[in-house]
Amino acid sequence: MEFKVIAEYFDKLEKISSRLQLTALLADLLSKSDKAIIDKVVYIIQGKLWPDFLGYPELGIGEKFLIKAISIATNTDENSVENLYKSIGDLGEVARRLKSKQQSTGILGFLGTSSKESLKVDEVYSTLSKVALTTGEGSRDLKIRLLAGLLKKADPLEAKFLVRFVEGRLRVGIGDATVLDAMAIAFGGGQSASEIVERAYNLRADLGNIAKIIVEKGIEALKTLKPEVGIPIRPMLAERLSNPEEILKKVGGSALVDYKYDGERAQIHKKDDKIFIFSRRLENITSQYPDVVEYISKYTEGKEFIIEGEIVAVDPESGEMRSFQELMHRKRKSDIYEAIKEYPVNVFLFDLMYYEDVDYTTKPLEVRRKLLESIVKPNDYVKIAHHIQVNNVEDLKSFFYRAISEGGEGVMVKAIGKDAIYQAGARGWLWIKLKRDYQSEMADTVDLVVVGGFYGKGKRGGKISSLLMAAYNPKTDTFESVCKVASGFSDEQLDELQKKLMEIKRDIKHPRVNSKMEPDIWVEPVYVAEIIGAEITISPLHTCCQDVVEKDAGLSIRFPRFIRWRDDKSPEDATTTDEILEMYNKQPKKKIESPPIDESV
């Protein structure tokens, strides 16, 4: 299969703003792809060489080295390449223009590159894999030579998307949900197969692997798919409510209640003597927690399992729980063993999804928890999450206050009926989080996605000083604008913000972004931030839950303030539009709705 086919589709996808058209075009590409390498094609579409959970190195080519590779491949002076880049701000476009210039001047033949040669997907994939995996002395020069070799063979369009791929900036607007829908259309006979494909992906979060199974064994093979140790399961997510009475009613009157810890959610896999740890974003974080690997090996029983818990920093003297920020300090230390001594951790387990070749995601919570408790040996490091079973509001409140007093964020209330399965990759009412109220009319913070930026005035003139934020709508796989946040940032954070956003800047609005407001720059929906505000109000300026509460208006957060970045969350883990609506419906209503704020000021 020629790489040119993918490049031509990428070129079309880049210009589309409709998700339906995006999905249809992507399905067309998948259906025309070589089935023998369908997994590689899917990874390339995702902008990666392999799934994140494998923990393999990224390509590791910076702008300086890309410029050198383009210079070598196009026989152009490095300064000229750099000046052109400064002028247009897109290295992919720089490569395309310089390759086009080569073609028009006939220099390709002089360089010994035949225009009849075609770049194959296999060659691109294997060469870029070498680039990523090459380490040691002389590795940078080898990476540059390998990349320059590909660019020499590439036509202008191929060169553009090769460079963007290496940069990690494909800019074609494709999310995992779009790929899933496209796979269902291309291989499953239509949109009706989406649920089957999505379930398989939730159990094995590897789109390339799922695509390979479909083309080799058919869509029916996905129906019997089980979790596999080493491939993370997409985590089950909770809804949120701030009223204990309503929570208990929602879960049927009785529930299992766990502490909600202020730590890092972790999915732990074991097979024989191999142990893997994955973050909630499904990244392999095993190397960050050699102490946890040791604890799991020593204090759990079973040859093969997938369990879930929270890694929490604890005080080395008292054993009391520390905050999430303390855990982040540990991650920033270069000497991991020094970090283990300074920031020790405990693991609080709360679920079991797979054990000895049996899929437990389809079994009730009480069955899963009972088995989980049976495989943990008594010890001081790996424990079952603090929990009780409640059937009245008083006990729920009492346990909630106890969790807060001991350093927790609140509690997780979990349904315990026969239908209380593990809903991989889904957010539902089987789990509901109850967190402490903040000193604000909003009962909780929200996690929102950055979709655009606005330049400041005065001393911040010409620099980004505020952000357009969006909530995630899982029904449409889009990000709907909900506020413009300008407060809560330190000067240092604003300077860092400028750099972060310029790296993901887009020429046009991302096809998954739904916004009436026009920021000064559009960006890829990549970064998630925790935001607090005064209240949620009706606004004609924003698209979150548009036409749901009031015609031609959406919901917005009044007086939003930045709290912190949520690097542990993917954009799809952000607060959903339904959650924003739920928070709006639950907050005390004023007799007259507050007028919308002019956010253009």
Swiss-Prot record:
Keywords: ATP-binding, Cell cycle, Cell division, DNA damage, DNA recombination, DNA repair, DNA replication, Ligase, Magnesium, Metal-binding, Nucleotide-binding
Entries under Pfam families matching the protein: DNA_ligase_A_C, DNA_ligase_A_M, DNA_ligase_A_N
Cofactor(s) the protein needs: Mg(2+)
EC number: 6.5.1.1
Cited InterPro entries: ATP-dep_DNA_ligase, DNA_ligae_ATP-dep_bac/arc, DNA_ligase_ATP-dep, DNA_ligase_ATP-dep_C, DNA_ligase_ATP-dep_cent, DNA_ligase_ATP-dep_CS, DNA_ligase_ATP-dep_N, DNA_ligase_N_sf
Keyword field contains Nucleotide-binding: yes
Chain residue ranges for the region called Disordered: 568-601
The protein's name: DNA ligase
